[in-house]
Each structure stands twice: as C-alpha cells, then as structure tokens.
C-alpha cells in the first residue's frame, strides 16, 4: 500500500471516530480539544490527531466501542501505535 493511500485510510478512520463524539464532549488542556484535533488532522499530523482523540477519556465517559474500533484500525495502519492501550479500553467497555 502506498503511503498516501495509507494516510487517506488513517484520516478516514480518525474522522469516523471524531464524528462519533457527542456534541457536549468536555474539552480540556489535559485531555481532548476539538480545535487541536482539527488542526492536527488538517496538517496531516495523524499520530497527534489520534492521540488528541484518545484524550477524550480524561474528562468524559468512555466513548462507544465503535469509536475505539476506529482508533484500533488507525493504529494498525500506523505500525500499531497505541494498539495495546486502545484494545485494553475497548475490552473494558
């Protein structure tokens, strides 16, 4: 798979996870910030965008299983970055 194709797939997984967040998601400097996520995703900083999304658990209830499945898919496309963490959270939901 070409790099640009992989990036497009990662981008799609991260955006799918983002769209699952409720509109009343709490934002904080220690967790998730919508503006930061969008800045990272638009700059193709996909790992930072993924890490911003996973920060949502700092100040909010654990998102749906579907959310974590999208992060797991993105992680697998990025050489398993944070895969164990995401699988652990998924198994706890």
Language model features: what each stretch is:
Residues 1-93:
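C-terminal-biased regions
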């Amino acid at each position: 798979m070409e790099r640009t194709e992989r990036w497009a797939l990662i981008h799609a997984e991260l955006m799918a996870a983002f769209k699952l967040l409720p509109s009343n998601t709490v934002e904080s400097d220690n967790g998730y910030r919508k503006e930061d996520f969008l800045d990272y995703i638009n700059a193709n900083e996909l790992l930072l965008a993924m890490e911003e999304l996973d920060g949502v658990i700092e100040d909010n209830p654990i998102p749906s299983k579907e959310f974590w499945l999208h992060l797991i898919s993105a992680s697998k496309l990025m050489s398993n970055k944070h895969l164990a963490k995401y699988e652990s959270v998924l198994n706890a939901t």
